[in-house]
Amino acid sequence: MAKQEQRFDYVKIALASPERIRQWGERTLPNGQVVGEVTKPETINYRTLKPEMDGLFCEKIFGPAKDWECHCGKYKRVRHRGIVCERCGVEVTESRVRRHRMGFIKLAAPVAHVWYLKGIPSYIAILLDMPLRDVEQIVYFNSYVVLNPGNHSELQYKQLLNEDQWMEIEDQIYAEESDLEGIEVGIGAEALQQLLQDLNLNEESEKLRQEIAESKGQKRAKLIKRLRVIDNFIGTESRPEWMVLNVIPVIPPDLRPMVQLDGGRFATSDLNDLYRRVINRNNRLARLQEILAPEIIVRNEKRMLQEAVDALIDNGRRGRTVVGANNRPLKSLSDIIEGKQGRFRQNLLGKRVDYSGRSVIVVGPNLKIHQCGLPREMAIELFQPFVIHRLIKNHSINNIKQAKKLIQKNDPLIWDVLEEVIEGHPVMLNRAPTLHRLGIQAFEPILVEGRAIQLHPLVCPAFNADFDGDQMAVHVPLSIEAQAEARMLMLASGNILSPATGQPIVTPSQDMVLGCYYLTAENPGAQKGAGRYFANLEDAIRAFEQGSVDLHAWVWVRFDGEVESEGESDEPESVVAADDGTVTKTYRFRRIRETEDGQRLSQYVKTTPGRILFNNTVQTALIH
């Protein structure tokens, strides 16, 4: 059967109606039989190790445990595809359908959804315009609620009554001379469902809009909050009573597996225990209702069913946490979804991707700001397709298999090809958590020995990285478009300013600041070569390199360009006239020789070899 391609624009998460939940789990077999309801708490038969019928692993509901094999073994081949066994009712198909086929449990009494009851904010409490404490009192069978005050003068709609108050009113209703009628009182999730059903959302929305226009302050904020919830219900075409469950879905069995261990014992998902509690209590409640058990016993069983469903959806949200063996809290549906180890963050957002790697970062002070050091071992793995392509294209290798063998043997040719491949091919480095766009930047890779990624110290503030064991991920942009985009938009040398403040984020720090200070510092104790004259800057640096002048020694260097010098007086400290008519003016940091008519012949600047080195470095960088 050809797979149909389904295109969609977005995924919408909304409340599911009881009919929708039944549709998820209910299927009509080719023989007309409707299956889907899980009615037994059993999982597998411990003697035959086969799933129990109508249980949590039922093959009739969820599909066969083995490919193309029914429960009783009558059909065992792919040629029987699609047949439903007459004896056991199992459809002959692939076992992987057990990863997506759902079931459902029909509840003997309605149950409030704990997310909407105990969530922050409580949507049920907001919609009913009642305090959360009162709603909880109703749901957990501590208080009655008036659903219809009838002709009783003292009763009000949604008023809470305790046991004694209700008994008193009941006595009045059934008294011989009583004229009370139309009084309706409820308790538990059934009463809550009735209250939610009575809500007319459109009318409430109109009424709230009028009240908001007339009110202010705290009251107005509360009304707006309620209106927002009501408008969302209207917008998604959901009904408030759907927050009370009559049917609960059973997730596919392969998502809550049961596996046999070496010693013959079984390891099972916590969900199976939570589902088993729900089914046991549900079946017991149905039986009690059948035999018309006393109201107090039925009510207690309904409360226990509510608590069992609460634990299944979100264990520990309300009441005592349900624990398994060795007092470990059981993992509910919410626990599987939420948090760092949950389905979204761990498996969907945090999944491993191809052409990516991860390693510890170390400082690479010899790198340029747009470069990173990539370990050879990692690079050959990441760029393997490009290397194989280049080998086949240029080096008379005939096929991929041959090229892979060369790579496995670490042939010297491979490293030359890898060097060619990575030249001009940027890689992207990412450090979690990526809190702003500079958390992922592009670099040109340089092959390095070892197993650590080398990073330029100036890009650390953008990544909020340091070298105390931080790890970073590498990603390779594959297409030409992706490479061009990485180079133009994401290269580290183009991300100098912070997107948040507009201030420079690449600023010298630590060793760099210390080095600049040390080069330009004054040290009166540095006397070696002090006072010497040099014809140009290069001569002074050469003298320092030969060791004849200290780094901080004051020397005079001929420099005929413009010199800016703060704190220097316009008046010379001394003026000396020579026999040839020239005049030498000495300032604090300059010595200028001029002709009689003021024409400059030469200028010497008082500086240190360190300052010359600093000036040359900055000047070279600015020119390039």
From Swiss-Prot:
Binding site for Mg(2+): D466, D468, D470
Protein EC: 2.7.7.6
Family in the record: Belongs to the RNA polymerase beta' chain family. RpoC1 subfamily.
Quaternary data: In cyanobacteria the RNAP catalytic core is composed of 2 alpha, 1 beta, 1 beta', 1 gamma and 1 omega subunit. When a sigma factor is associated with the core the holoenzyme is formed, which can initiate transcription.
HAMAP family xrefs: RNApol_bact_RpoC1
Described function: DNA-dependent RNA polymerase catalyzes the transcription of DNA into RNA using the four ribonucleoside triphosphates as substrates.
Binding note for cofactor: Binds 1 Mg(2+) ion per subunit. Binds 1 Zn(2+) ion per subunit.
Keywords, alphabetical: DNA-directed RNA polymerase, Magnesium, Metal-binding, Nucleotidyltransferase, Transcription, Transferase, Zinc
Catalytic activity from the UniProt record: RNA(n) + a ribonucleoside 5'-triphosphate = RNA(n+1) + diphosphate
CC terms in the record's Gene Ontology section: DNA-directed RNA polymerase complex
NCBIfam families in the record: PRK02625.1, rpoC1_cyan
Name of this protein: DNA-directed RNA polymerase subunit gamma
Residues holding Zn(2+): C70, C72, C85, C88
Organism of derivation: Synechococcus elongatus (strain ATCC 33912 / PCC 7942 / FACHB-805)
Cofactor dependence: Mg(2+); Zn(2+)
GO MF term (any one): DNA-directed RNA polymerase activity
Keyword field contains Zinc: yes
GO biological process: DNA-templated transcription
InterPro entries assigned to the protein according to its UniProt record, in alphabetical order: DNA-dir_RpoC1_gamma, DNA-dir_RpoC_beta_prime, RNA_pol_asu, RNA_pol_N, RNA_pol_Rpb1_1, RNA_pol_Rpb1_3, RNA_pol_Rpb1_3_sf, RNA_pol_Rpb1_clamp_domain
